[in-house]
Amino acid sequence: MKYVIKAAAVFALILALTAATAAQSALLNVSYDPTRELYEEFNAAFVKFWKTKSGKDITFRHSHGGSGSQARAVIDGLDADVVTLALAYDIDAIAQSGLIDKAWQKRLPQNSSPYTSTIVFLVRKGNPKGIKDWGDLVRQGVQVITPNPKTSGGARWNYLAAWEYAKRRAGGNDAKAREFVSALFKNVPVLDSGARGATTTFVQRGIGDVLLAWENEAYLAIAEQKDKVDIVVPSISILAEPPVTVVDKVVAKKGTKAIADAYLQYLYSPEGQEIAAKHYYRPRDQKVAAKYANRFAKVQLFTIDEAFGGWQAAQKTHFADKGTFDQIYKPGQ
């Protein structure tokens, strides 16, 4: 009987050690909606890099969705080793829960944003509605597809880009911008929860005349549906800076801090920057950016800091409960 008990104890210990080892070698990246293709290729490259560096194998798990929803999932217990989200406010929200150091943005270069993007338009082939700039989105008879700013990071970039366009026009101010964005959302027939869902609504389901899209998502749609859609680059747009960080409490518990740190640092490596550029994210590395310069349209860009005073201020004013978006978006009206 003693041998049976000892054998059972040993077996339980082996199972526990096996589970711990598996946890240490499997990294969960919780990301925003349209990064699937980017991280599929990047992860494969990092697996080779890590094997060469450490002699150890590593596997990845993925979770993709609207950036705000993803942040909430991590706060509620999704065991992300790293988060690669659409905007800094969503990581700040996780930090407020105690899972991430509040000074997270200082840990990596460029405010922990290894690549940038912007917002462009995707229109039907031949641009039958003649959409050229933000002002065309409020015309009668133009249906605009954009995700829900309450759940999607990309949608918040869309909203803020439209707001600042209106504010910078002749005679523009916050009141005029509010009128403009309110008119724009009256032309939105449906709000998907994330950017990929909005792309599916526009490209696959054929709803709408114009999609407000991440630049990389627009180019991916062109690659897959070049006979159905075209890209229109507006006169002005926002510099979107998707940030990344390690989830401190999770990596401490799982023992994955070294791997998670190396994973995010590798995004800044020449190979990581090349992969980002190949997937139409604007690289930070100047040499890689110069190599891929012809991939990206020249567009006047403004930052959220200069236009809105940063994400905390923008979130409080526009996207918090009873904020400007809640005031202007009236479905069915």
Locations of the language-model features?
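A bilobed periplasmic-binding-protein/Venus flytrap-type ligand-binding module shared by bacterial periplasmic
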Residues: I119-N127, E241-A258, I275-H279
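Short helix-loop capping/hinge motifs at secondary-structure junctions, enriched
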Residues: G126-K132, T151, E164-G172, V250-A258
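Bacterial N-terminal signal peptides
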Residues: A8-T18
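Extracellular/periplasmic juxtamembrane helices and adjacent flexible linkers that interface
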Residues: V251-Q333
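Positively charged n-region of N-terminal signal peptides that target proteins for export
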Residues: M1-K6
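N-terminal segment of the mature folded domain
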Residues: Q24-S152, K330
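Short beta-strand->loop
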Residues: V30-Y32, V123-K125, Q143-A170, L184-V188, ...
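Ligand-binding pocket segment of bilobal, Venus flytrap-like solute-binding proteins
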Residues: R169-S235
